[in-house]
């Protein structure tokens, strides 16, 4: 049985977590063994939801707190090394949220060759895309975005992935997330008094 490692900075209640939970359910339904590794913050409720979906869950931070700077890199290195030794995943799927690049670089350094990254936002939150482009070109098998607009904001072009899409030279794609499409964004003036 193929083991898939899902890497995510936090397991709270948000769109990325719900999308990742849907991903876990799909992998489990196809017969894969899924291990979800949460680096930092988590809610017990969300951990239980992932477990009920069929994933084993490893929370690296016993207190659910974030570790920053060099200590954070060392913390992630030790935690990911322990998870890789214990579960020996065939594929790592990293949710590209802060710290997005560091876990990918550490996984590569620790010998993981099959890495997929998914970014859940558009590129305007990044002051510079050089690191994202380096990761996309040299460190991951595929870099997926949740909308074509997001993919274009990162890479200048987009392509909706389907089962016939070849995974060769071009390794960034759009795979729409499974969140309801019916959200409307309303711009309104609000007074905070």
Predicted regions and their residues:
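Membrane-interface segments of envelope glycosyltransferases acting on lipid-linked substrates or membrane lipids
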Residues: 1-193
